[in-house]
Design a protein with these regions (language model features):
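Transmembrane alpha-helices and adjacent helix-loop boundaries
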Residues: 1-378
């Protein structure tokens, strides 16, 4: 019996890697085939049909109301229209929640490193308290102990004559739907793009000037802001933007909870920067704010972004807890449709595909950002 030669392809490292990946792929395919075959057999045994055609069937209306609907919807619409409402509601929470959580997390993270004893201790108490209590419990607190305890709409709390707060939600000023508003928005978008471009070119004065002229001024005077107003006929509040108590609860809960984890990520990233960088920047006469903005934070970003991506993904997945407080996101509406139609498998596939798509988009975006801020070794 002869031993295999060392130069055999079995000992080729490239072949071993490819062979291992092929084996793993085959195993995954076999697992999917096994469960798919079981699904088909069970559907046939129970004489059930599989398909998504019912979502678009106009003869089968959704027949249920959706309280928080940002787009036009009625119970006579199709199930697909109801799903679209849930999708928009989920996007509202995800986008605004990620933006607010990152902003609050950075502030709290910097507070954890503050030289002020009181600020540092308050930030520490916030992080340790929020991180060590369940998110669902926090949502119940915000909903049942805060928003539902607010006054009725007739006795709304009023702030500066422009903001109203009651147990049905929050009412805020909002731009009117007019040509002037859309023109101002277009100018603001161009101003933001120009400011980002100038900041990348290290032209700070031009960047601040473009922000002032093309963003701040149109924001204050260009947009036709409409403030909420109490209707004396029916005691309702008209105009402005209405954020329901369910939406506000979920947004606050997700923001506060996720920001606690982001704060620790930011703190760890900043502390990973060599202490000599601080001392060198201070020796050049830079103020602490400039040291953080120009020297420390850019070096901390490559450390911060990977775990920050995980926290953004967790926020997206945690948003499915909306069903616990009655907010109609994609998961809540899918559950209602599954109960009415018996299409539980199809709706589960829709929900899984939706969250998978959102998470893949976030992952790809954050990976691109991570490549941009990566420190290039010479």
């Amino acid at each position: 019996m002869t031993l295999p030669q060392k130069n055999s392809f079995w000992y080729d490292e490239r072949f071993q890697k490819i062979f291992l990946q092929v084996i793993i792929l085959l195993i995954v395919c076999l697992i999917f085939w096994f469960f798919g075959r079981n699904l088909v057999i069970n559907f046939q045994r129970l004489r059930l049909s599989f398909g998504f055609g019912f979502l678009f069937d106009s003869d089968r209306p959704a027949s249920f109301a959706i309280g928080d609907s940002p787009i036009a919807y009625s119970p006579t619409d199709t199930y697909f229209r109801a799903l679209l409402v849930g999708l928009v509601n989920s996007l509202r929470i995800m986008i605004s929640g990620i933006f607010l959580a990152i902003s609050l997390g950075i502030v709290i993270g910097l507070g954890r490193l503050s030289d002020n004893w009181l600020i540092r201790q308050l930030a520490t108490i916030y992080v340790e308290t929020i991180r060590n209590t369940p998110l669902l419990l926090q949502l119940f607190f915000w909903y049942f102990a805060v928003f539902l305890k607010l006054p009725k709409i007739e006795e709304s709390l009023e702030f500066f004559g422009r903001v109203f707060l009651n147990n049905s939600g929050v009412y805020l000023p909002f731009p009117a739907n007019s040509f002037r508003t859309w023109l101002a928005l277009a100018i603001m978008i161009l101003g933001i793009i120009l400011s980002v471009f100038l900041s990348l070119k290290n032209k700070l004065i031009l960047c601040l000037t473009s922000l002032l002229i093309l963003v701040i001024i149109p924001l204050i005077w260009g947009l036709q802001w409409q403030s909420p107003q109490v209707n004396p006929l029916n005691q309702n509040i008209d105009f402005g933007l209405h954020l329901s108590s369910e939406f506000a609860t979920l947004l606050i809960g997700l923001t506060v909870y996720t920001a606690a984890f982001i704060a620790e990520t930011v703190r760890g990233g900043i502390q990973s920067v060599n202490r000599g960088q601080w001392e060198a920047a201070k020796a050049l006469g830079l103020k602490p704010l400039l040291v953080m903005r120009l020297v420390i934070f850019p070096q901390a970003l490559p450390v911060i972004i990977p775990p920050l991506t995980n926290e953004c993904l967790n926020l997206v997945k945690n948003s499915s807890l909306a069903i616990a407080i009655g907010y109609n996101d994609i998961y809540a509406i899918s559950s209602t449709i599954a109960n009415q139609t018996g299409k539980a498998v199809e709706m589960l596939i829709v929900v899984m595909a939706t969250y998978l798509f959102f998470n893949l988009v976030i992952s790809l975006t954050m990976n691109q950002l991570n490549q941009r801020v990566k420190i290039q070794e010479r």
